[in-house]
């Protein structure tokens, strides 16, 4: 099986490690031309890029993917599936989530809290669904836990509860998941983000109890205690974050469903401000004010 990995960050490296020696891998990032002359198409494409890169990934997949091939997105947040489906057709796109803590060390080596667990639903079309099954088998052979579900949206919203609770708070307070659990301000804030996200999920048709949502993020926080969230890593590195696709998307979906989500909206603004470049003018203003 020929598999493209679109986005070579930590999750891309993790998936590549699982598939190494089991599939013919094509690594694609923004520095590589998506299709070289004479290059074969791929049977499957795994989208592991951050949300801002999804339109790019959709364009690359459209050029690389075999007509009977499948695209599997295991990205964070909302909106990625729709972007891919609009470009490639819903019948070829599989939606899933991954649970793992991972980061690339300065020397380029991979740190992860484990092999990773994926929950995903196959696409509707027969050919892409068969390729999805083959890909799931290869990932399992590489040590990943892969659960195939009929409806991906409960998995998406449950992962979103954890992301919405932990990612912005760890970024705001500069702490690991374990440190967040013990933080006198951060932990209650994450609890409220989880409760609010559960209310929005229920409004969107995925019933999640508020107490269940709180227990969910806390359980993941304990399991992946040493992990530094991807949003914390992005803020520390001065990279764009996925705040709009996570807390921003929760707030927007809440507005659409008539479910207020003011804490998610506030966190979206705070992390966006935290991520703004601080140039010489900002430094000069700070010095003048001091």
Tell me what each language-model feature is.
Residues 17-18, 35-109:
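Rossmann-like NAD(P)(H) cofactor-binding subdomain of soluble oxidoreductases
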Residues 63-64, 83, 87-92, 109-210:
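Internal alpha-helical scaffold of NAD(P)-dependent oxidoreductase catalytic cores
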Residues 1-36:
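NAD(P)+-binding Rossmann beta1-loop-alpha1 motif at the extreme N-terminus of oxidoreductases
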């Amino acid at each position: 099986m020929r598999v493209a990995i679109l986005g070579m960050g930590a999750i891309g490296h993790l998936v590549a490690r699982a598939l190494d020696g089991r599939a013919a891998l094509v690594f694609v990032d923004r520095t590589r031309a998506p299709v070289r002359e004479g290059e074969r198409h791929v049977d499957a494409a795994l989208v592991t890029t951050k949300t801002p890169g999804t339109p790019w990934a959709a364009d690359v997949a459209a050029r690389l993917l075999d007509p009977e091939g499948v695209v599997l997105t295991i990205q964070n947040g909302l909106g990625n599936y729709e972007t891919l489906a609009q470009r490639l057709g819903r019948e070829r796109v599989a939606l899933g989530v991954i649970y793992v803590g991972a980061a690339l060390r300065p020397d380029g080596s991979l740190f992860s809290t484990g092999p990773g667990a994926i929950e995903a639903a196959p696409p509707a079309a027969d050919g892409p669904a068969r390729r999805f099954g083959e890909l799931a088998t290869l990932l399992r052979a590489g040590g990943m836990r892969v659960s195939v579900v009929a409806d991906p949206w409960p998995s998406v919203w449950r992962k979103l509860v954890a992301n919405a609770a932990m990612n912005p708070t760890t970024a705001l307070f500069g702490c690991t998941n374990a440190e967040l659990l013990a933080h006198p301000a951060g932990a209650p804030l994450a609890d409220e983000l989880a409760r609010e996200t559960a209310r929005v999920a229920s409004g969107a048709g995925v019933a999640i109890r508020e107490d269940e949502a709180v227990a969910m993020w806390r359980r993941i926080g304990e399991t992946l205690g040493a992990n530094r969230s991807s949003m914390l890593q992005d803020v520390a590195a001065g990279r764009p974050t996925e705040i709009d696709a996570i807390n921003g998307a929760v707030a927007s979906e809440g507005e659409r469903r008539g479910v207020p989500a003011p804490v998610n909206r506030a966190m979206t603004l705070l992390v966006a401000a935290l991520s703004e470049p601080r140039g010489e003018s900002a430094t000069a203003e700070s010095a003048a004010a001091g």
